[in-house]
Design a protein with these regions (language model features):
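Lectin-like carbohydrate-binding module/patch detector with strong preference for beta-trefoil
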Residues: 2-219
Length: 219
């Protein structure tokens, strides 16, 4: 009888629906707040409270490419970025972005990709970050790995972006530009992971997470 009593709870557990046992399926399904491929969003640097930004202003030194900055305003249309994969087939619209996945961030208004390379940044002498390419097509220096702690990049998470080609982290340390982009902050790459390179998804149009890219809705 004692062994029968021990077996009864195990048999009951086996008969329960999986929906009543959420811990057994943890990590298989994306949470409703997962950031997805194709979503358009703004990214807030959590240390300096500025949003990742670009515009049709080129650097006067270094690469001479389109500049990338941080702005305090939350309503600036030049702060929207589209989430894309290393290729369009690797990150279909509506697919949740996994921690450790390489993505591209394409500036919506100019069609250029977030980019870095071995040029010094103009103010802090870290690594220059620019916007590069045409109509969303650039080169292999446009790839960034999303670093987060779970299975998927969640909207509530503070995440890091580590550059695939040069291994720097997308960062802000507070330096401000003068004319013609007075008050905007320098965005650059830093070799070390620290509190200057945490980012959080903010305003935007998010595609509802789905493991089946054919089934999605905009939120």
């Amino acid at each position: 009888m004692r062994s029968g009593r021990r077996l009864f709870p195990l048999l009951l557990l086996a008969l329960l629906p999986l929906a009543l046992l959420p811990g057994l399926c943890h990590g298989r399904e994306p949470a409703p707040g997962a950031v997805t491929c194709g979503s358009v969003l703004k990214l807030l640097n959590t240390r300096h409270s500025v949003r990742l930004h670009s515009h049709e202003v080129k650097y006067g030194s270094g690469s001479g490419q389109q500049s990338v900055t941080g702005v305090e305003a939350s309503d600036d249309a030049n702060s929207y970025w589209r989430i894309r994969g290393k290729s369009d087939s690797s990150c279909q619209r509506g697919t949740p972005v996994k921690c450790g996945q390489a993505i591209r961030l394409t500036h919506v208004n100019t069609g250029k990709n977030l980019h870095t390379h071995h040029f010094p940044s103009p103010l802090s002498n870290n690594q220059e970050v620019s916007a590069f390419g045409d109509d969303g097509e650039g080169d292999d220096l446009d790839f960034w790995i999303v670093q987060c702690s779970g299975t998927y990049w969640e909207r509530e998470d503070a995440v890091r972006f580590k550059h695939v080609g040069t291994e720097v982290f997308l960062s802000i340390t507070g330096e401000q530009y003068g004319h013609p982009i007075r008050g905007q902050r320098e965005v650059h790459g830093m070799p070390a992971a620290n509190h200057h390179n945490y980012w959080k998804a903010m305003e935007g149009v998010f595609i509802k997470p789905s493991l089946d890219p054919a089934k999605h809705d905009e939120l």
